[in-house]
Every structure is written in C-alpha cells, then in structure tokens.
A protein has these predicted regions:
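A short SAM/SAH-binding and catalytic strip from SAM-dependent methyltransferases
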Residues: 98-112
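Short alpha-helix
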Residues: 163-178
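A short glycine-rich, Lys/Arg-flanked "PGG" loop and its adjoining helix->strand segment in the class I
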Residues: 112-127
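C-terminal helical/coil "lid" or tail adjacent to the Rossmann-like core of SAM-dependent
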Residues: 183-239
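Conserved class I S-adenosyl-L-methionine
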Residues: 1-37, 48-52, 72, 76, 127-154
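Class I SAM-dependent methyltransferase SAM/SAH-binding core
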Residues: 40-42, 46-90
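A short acidic, Gly/Pro-enriched loop at the edge of an enzyme's catalytic core
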Residues: 88-99
Length: 256
C-alpha cells in the first residue's frame, strides 16, 4: 500500500471530534504524573491534554507533526511549550520521565522508528503510557470507503496505507525488541458516539479520511462519503445516533 501524510483541520477537530481528547482524560489517570516529572505529550493535537498535564508536573512539552494543530495549541495554551515534530524521528536534548500519547500513534506507519524515538527520549526507568487504534479499528468504515473508491476506479486511493492498527501481541513484541519492559497491555472495544446525528460518518471521513481523496473529484467525494454512511448504517447507527467502530490499545512500558 502507498504511504501518505494526512493534513489536519484543527477547527473541525475541535468542533466535531472533541471526543478524541475527552476520552484521553482517563489515560492521564493511568499516567499518574508526579509533580517533579518531565512529561512529553507525543501527538498532542490541539493541546488540551497537554494543558491538563501541565498543572500536575514540573514540565510538559507537546509535539505534533501537524503545523496546524501546533498553531492551534499555542494559541489556546500560550503557557505550554509546543513544537512541530515527527513521532518517527524526533530528538530531545534532555530526557523525559514519561511519554504520554493519546490517539496518535496509529497515524505513524513507521512504527518501529517511533518506538526507537520514544526509547531514546526517555531516561532509564522512564515509561510510555499510550493509547491508539488497535487491530480492526474502524474496520467497518474503512472497508466501506475502500470499496466505494474501487467501484469508481480510484484504485490508487483505495490502496493508501494511512494507519497502523496492530494487535496487542505485535505491538508489545516490538516494544520488547526495542528494550522496553511491558507492564500493562489492553485491547478493548470502544464504540464512539459521533456529534452529528445526521452526518456523523460523513464528518468523520472529512476529518480523518480526507487523505483518501487526493485526486478524487469534489462531486465523487460527496457521493462516496454519503454512500459510505449509507453502507455502514445497519451496523453503526443505533438509537438515532452514529457511532464509529473504534478498537483501542492501551500500553504501559518502561525503559530498562
């Protein structure tokens, strides 16, 4: 499959997809940050969780590959340090006690490079506390989207490799190979309610699947998005509300 870089609409993210960081609040509890710690928020998005962490620790830094997201984060939370950086190849001058990452690492298809980057950024005994899409995450939506693209002759777009959704076994093995000790790992089913009861799936595709539409006509984009929503309705529309079929991984691991 072809690898691509996704572009982000920070305003749409905040307006209709705030569930991304709302669900991440419980991950901060798993992080259990201490007042004397230096924390790195990897894939911080528009910075809401980074800001929450900032009041609990000595120092926090937010990194994200998207300049649009970092600009939004800096505007909303000027007291917090945010920088543009790629999770697959970032470097730090001073080691961190922990790396926190919510709903970001499935966007990094160079996952081995990301694991190596996290390892070098931690002090000995430091930990990662991460959550992201696991095996079969949004399978219903992505299968329907690829099928609609193929049907209209957009075979190249349908083959795009946009995400990394590993099993628990695959990801924890990669962490151990890199030198981490895995102390907690969980895969779970988390159907996620979408904001708009009329255009929930269309909005989700606009936010998270727009990279599939490079080279697709505007007319076809509209038709495909609506078609996908119609296809998945029997499975993902319940009691008058739209849900995305999220499957999540949570992992805590320490640098030995």
């Amino acid at each position: 499959m072809t690898q691509v870089t996704h572009s982000w609409n920070a305003q749409l993210y905040n307006d209709k997809h705030a569930f991304v960081y709302d669900y991440g609040k419980s991950l901060i509890e798993l992080l259990a940050p201490k007042s004397n710690e230096r924390i790195l928020d990897l894939g911080c998005g528009s910075g809401e969780l980074t800001f929450d962490i900032s009041g609990l620790v000595k120092m926090v830094m937010g990194l994200d590959k998207s300049p649009e997201m970092i600009a939004k984060a800096k505007y909303n939370f000027p007291s917090v340090n945010f920088e543009v950086a790629d999770a697959a190849n970032f470097k730090v001058e001073e080691k961190f006690d922990a790396i926190f990452s919510n709903a970001a690492l499935h966007w990094v298809v160079q996952y081995e490079e990301a694991i190596a980057s996290m390892y070098q950024a931690l002090c000995t005994g430091g930990r990662i506390v991460v959550e992201f899409g696991g095996k079969n995450n949004i399978r219903t939506i992505s299968d329907a989207l690829r099928e609609s693209l193929y049907k209209r002759g957009y075979e190249k777009q349908a083959r795009i490799n946009l995400w990394y959704f590993p099993s628990i076994g695959e990801y924890t093995s990669k962490l151990e190979e890199a030198g981490f000790e895995v102390v907690f790992a969980q895969w779970y089913d988390r159907p996620t309610e979408l904001v708009d009861n009329h255009t929930g799936i269309v909005d989700w595709i606009t936010m998270f699947g727009s990279s599939f539409f490079d080279g697709v006509t505007n007319e076809d984009i509209i038709e495909i998005s609506k078609e996908v929503q119609d296809k998945v309705k029997p499975e993902l529309f319940k009691d008058g509300k739209w849900y995305a079929d999220y499957k999540r991984i949570r992992v805590v691991a320490r640098k030995k």
